[in-house]
Amino acid sequence: MFPAVSFRIPTAWRVQGRIEDVADILSKPEEFPRWWGEVYLSVTTTKPGDAQGIGQTVAVHSKGWLPYRLNWQGTLVENHMPTSWTVEATGDLVGRGIWTLSQHGDTAEIDYDWSVRSDRLLFRVLAPLLRWVMVSNHRWAMAKGERGLQAELARRAGA
C-alpha cells in the first residue's frame, strides 16, 4: 500500500583545508560521533576492509532533528582517496553515498551525492506528505557535518 520512498540529496561543502586532510577525517567514520555528534550517535567497525579499505563495514546509529533514529550499515565499495570514494548503505537506508573532493586554492570542495531508499514504514507513510521535511532533516544533518568538519580541521591544525 505504501511503496518504498527514494531520496537523492546532493550536498556541497566548502571548507578551508587540504583534501588530503578532509579525506583522512572522512575516512574514519568511527570518529564521526566526536566531531559530528549531533547526528552520529555511534559508529562501530563490524568488518575490516582490505589494504585499500574496500569492504570495511560500519554499523551506524544516527539521527536528525526529527524524532526518529536510523540504524544502518555503511560499506566502502570504491576507494580513490583523496578525491573520491563510495559507501553502500543497507538497513533502514539502502543505497549509495558518493564523496567527491577537489582542491581550489586553500579551499577543499566536498560534494556528497546521497541516493537512498527506505522501506521503513514511517518513511513510506510520511513521505507523500512530508517529503520536504525529511529532506530538510538531511540538510540540517549535513550542515552540522560541514561545521563539525571545519572545526575538526582547525583542531588538527592547532595540534
Positions of predicted regions on the chain:
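Hydrophobic ligand-binding cavity/cleft-lining segments
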Residues: 1-50, 159
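Glycine-rich portal/gate segments that line the openings of hydrophobic small-molecule binding cavities
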Residues: 2, 34, 44-96, 109, ...
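Hydrophobic beta-strand positions in extracellular immunoglobulin-like domains
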Residues: 15, 62, 114-116
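Structural motif
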Residues: 16, 79-81, 104
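Beta-strand/loop substructures that line and gate deep hydrophobic ligand-binding cavities in soluble
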Residues: 86-143
